[in-house]
């Protein structure tokens, strides 16, 4: 009886060829940027090619990061950051214009960009997406909206099932944390101090408390839902301030929906959260 032949004889298995690490440039070294660095530096899958900061020589103390060992990779010049030819730029700057300029410069060089800077992306998301496509690059910005909450992914899933009519959501963690503390009897200044201590509020909280951050989030979500974004300057905003204490139970809500002739959007404080 002949043996059954399954196929041609295979060569003995050999170890897989090691993949080259992904070359990553990090723009921004604040709370989020430093956290990203602490994850990337010890991971052999990644090579940090540069870090963009305002003051490269400033002494930094973050647990788990030996800044002295990577001091030569710090720069204040975006051109130097990109000259290292990273595969990807992680853009985590706090400035809208600087972030926007860096994103454009990277995409024009065919470098993939992952951004957590909603103020930068929301300036012109359609143009940035087109720029990325024109140069064969990828632009991802889920981190710019909702922190760890998959807001953009949720909208995309809803859109795949049918047209989106509108959305309402709590879009800013700082303001809603402060509203909870105000409900508990804290003063505005106390609530703001606690928000900073909890890692919610920036040193300059104006973007949050004046509603600019929520308005930028609305623009990004509207772009995903409707393919167009309302003018950020034209979005009505109710600010949270020390002079006017909100009604107990208030929440800051971002709203955008289709209306005849376009989109209606606003940032409001609602006592019932609806």
Annotate each language-model stretch with its function.
Residues 181-182, 190-274:
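Substrate-binding/catalytic subdomain of NAD(P)-dependent oxidoreductase enzymes
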Residues 27, 91-93, 116, 123, ...:
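Structural motif
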Residues 98-105, 118-155:
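Rossmann-fold NAD(P)-binding glycine/threonine-rich loop
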């Amino acid at each position: 009886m002949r043996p059954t032949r399954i196929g041609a004889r295979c060569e003995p298995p050999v170890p897989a060829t090691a993949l080259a690490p992904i070359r990553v440039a990090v723009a921004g070294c604040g709370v989020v940027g430093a956290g990203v660095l602490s994850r990337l530096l010890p991971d052999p899958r990644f090579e940090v090619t540069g870090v963009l900061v305002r003051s490269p020589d400033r002494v930094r103390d973050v647990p788990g990061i030996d800044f002295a060992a990577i001091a030569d990779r710090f720069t204040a010049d975006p051109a130097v950051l990109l000259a290292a030819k990273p595969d990807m730029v992680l853009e985590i700057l706090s400035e809208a214009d600087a972030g926007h300029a860096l994103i454009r410069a990277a995409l024009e060089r065919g470098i993939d960009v992952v951004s957590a800077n909603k103020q930068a992306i929301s300036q012109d998301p359609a143009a940035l997406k087109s720029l990325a496509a024109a140069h064969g690059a990828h632009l991802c910005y889920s981190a710019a909206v909702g922190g760890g909450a998959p807001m953009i992914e949720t909208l995309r899933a809803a859109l795949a099932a049918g047209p989106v009519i509108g959305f309402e959501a709590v879009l800013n963690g700082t303001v809603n944390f402060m509203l909870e503390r105000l409900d508990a009897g804290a003063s505005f200044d106390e609530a703001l101090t606690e928000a900073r201590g909890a890692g919610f509020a920036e040193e300059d909280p104006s973007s949050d408390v004046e509603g600019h951050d929520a308005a930028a989030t609305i623009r990004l979500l509207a772009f995903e839902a409707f393919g167009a974004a309302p003018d950020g300057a034209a979005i009505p905003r109710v600010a949270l301030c020390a002079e006017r204490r909100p009604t107990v139970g208030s929440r800051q809500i971002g709203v955008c929906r289709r209306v005849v002739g376009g989109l209606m959007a606003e940032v409001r404080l609602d006592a019932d959260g609806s």
